[in-house]
Amino acid sequence: MPVRRIVALLVLGLMIREAFSFWTGHPFDFELWVRLGYAVNHGGDPYGILPPAPGLSFANLFSSDSTPTIAYLPFWPLLTGLMYATYSMIGLNDRFLYYFLLKQPVIIGDVTLAYLLYSYISSRKPGASGAWAIFFWLFSPFTIMLSGVWGMFDSIAICFIILSASAVSRVKSGLWAGLGVFAKSVPIIFVTPLTLRNIRNGKSIVAIVVALALPLSLSAAVFLVMRWPVTLVNSTIASTAGKGGWSMSIWDVFFYVNSLGWLPSSAPLLYGALGLVWIPALLVFTWVAIRRFRTDTDEGLFQALLVCALIFLIFKARVTEQYALYLLALAVIDVALWNPQRKTLLTLTTIVAIIYLVVNNYFLIRFLSPIYPGYVNFENAMIAPFSNLITIFHVIAGTAFTVLNVKYLLNLLGGRRSSLRPV
């Protein structure tokens, strides 16, 4: 594809996201970013309860069950703090400017990811496949809503995953993987296949150590320099491992039935225990993937990465919409380079994720919260007559997403001969 056309597509994708950047946002997550950037610059504890930011906050959906706290390593607090510092330096007292600045790392990360997908594919298969990939990512309603509207930053972490998979040196691969974990902890599920491609190779052992030690070292350095207290960090971050609730998965059925009171009083304890099943499941299937696929090849590596992503999505007690980005990014490369027959599966998965996102967020009304303070009342008035029907759609979409994940996993484990290790 000509360079001018690539640039034009990237600029268009950027402009579409920027059009939503300053006046939309999720009333829980994006409001947290607003409070977080303010707290970092005013001596607050980013891992404690974040109070509203004076003159900047726009929502307060928080409760005893959903407190205004974060569960990320220091990368994101630092970045939101930098955006607030930039806002303060500009000196224009306009909260929408702050919202615009907070969205910039997210949007730039998402557009950069589109280019990285194109670059990876085109370097291995010149032709139309790279063009399809960049079109898919830049203009998918799902990616646009998550970055430009919602304000979720997972695309930044996925950029590091793609860079890690692209690295020739195992140590460099470990460095990129470590930065991905530092950006958001989800990429830790990919560290083993990204770095441990040959257990007999000493560089692979070094790479996995680097990938795990780097985010810990960077986090420790930030806490020392910023003098942030560490009393709440471990419990806050660890609490997300088995966190449950409404989920873009078949777990929605369990949560729905429990909400109706049809399960015994011990069900929440069982649900909490089952919420941790994804960890041993991931360990087992990571071992299976490394044994089954030739992870020293590009194709085998991405098959293994897809297995890790799918196991995470299938067994995690709470799957939020942004988690699907990890699967979709890997699947785009898989479909474009090696398995075009899976394009229908990728398309269906994306459509189901979009449906779930729309239904789960009250038909997108809540994203207007920065400009419409009465959005909660409007949501209630519009949704109340159809609440049962919406809940059913919610459960169906979540279950359908898991069914598609299982189908993709079975397809993967069938494997093409070129991606499998010799017996």
State where each predicted segment sits:
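Multi-pass membrane glycosyltransferase architecture that uses lipid-linked
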Residues: 1-248, 270-423
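Generic multipass alpha-helical transmembrane bundles of integral membrane proteins
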Residues: 250-266
